[in-house]
Amino acid sequence: MNIKVFTCGGTFEKVYNPISGELSFQDSCIPNVIKRSRITLKVDFEELFFKDSLNMDNDDRLMIAHKIKIEPIKNIVVIHGTDTMVQTAQTIKEHASQDKVVVMTGAMLPYSIKESDAMFNFGGAFIATQTLEPGIWISMNGHIFRSDDVEKNKRKGVFERA
């Protein structure tokens, strides 16, 4: 089995810059996440762009949906910012083929920070792509959600059933 991993950036991919005191994007952490996870399946990785999901627009979402639609690999993980992940999932559902298992995930803290949830969420999404039926899913906080039955609770900082 092959797994495709697309990254769009989001907090998952950000790195703390000690000079500016800001979080910003550098090189993708996903190759290191895959290596540290000791994954033995074939993984095809592709960077789509590096954006905070609050800065994504409809064209970005349509581009993600198009890349998924034309991707020959049927099991796909999408790394995405958490603020608009549900919105992008709906766009994918509307515009991409429904014969693939697409699992979106992200992180509340960057992978580069020790207490991050990034590795856990990636592992959950990676395994979910191998076990779920075709559709658009979100894997966050140890749960798997259907894309049309989930919301981010910004007060608690977790994803919940809608």
Where are the predicted features?
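Active-site histidine-anchored catalytic micro-motif
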Residues: 1-162
